[in-house]
Amino acid sequence: MNNLKVYVTSIIFLFLSSAIHSSEIGNKMKITGEFQVKLQPLDSYAKGAEGINLGRMSLDKTFSGALDATSKGEMLSAMTSTKGSAGYVAIEQVVGSLSGKKGSFVLQHFGTMNRGKDRLILEVVPDSGTGELTGLSGKMLIKIESGKHFYEFEYELSTK
């Protein structure tokens, strides 16, 4: 189980390729900040076969900056026997404040790595915003620099 935790942590670090600030782009806002992440192995339903390693982890984050929030979620991952090829999906609910507006929203992750070349899609689930974050849409980028995690979040709050 400990090897699985190291493996999944390695996948996340490989996927996640700044100072805190906020800027407006049309109706969209763009903020950056730092976050801490804690991953813990969970019992898996499915077991990998024929060189595939499947994993399931809990995901706990604390965001700082214009996104002052915590999140909880789950991640599923698959690592192939080919070095640098893997994939993961995750769902996390973020609860707190975004640029002073309180509420929650859900982020969905989809990441693949093809022999070391990574691709990550991290978006707000449509209609998942609550409270003052109702109508939230957006995309998040994640970077790791010198062992620290940073986010860049471009979002929009519609009044529809």
PLM features: residue spans?
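Targeting-peptide/extracellular-domain and disordered-appendage signature
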Residues: 4-6, 14-160
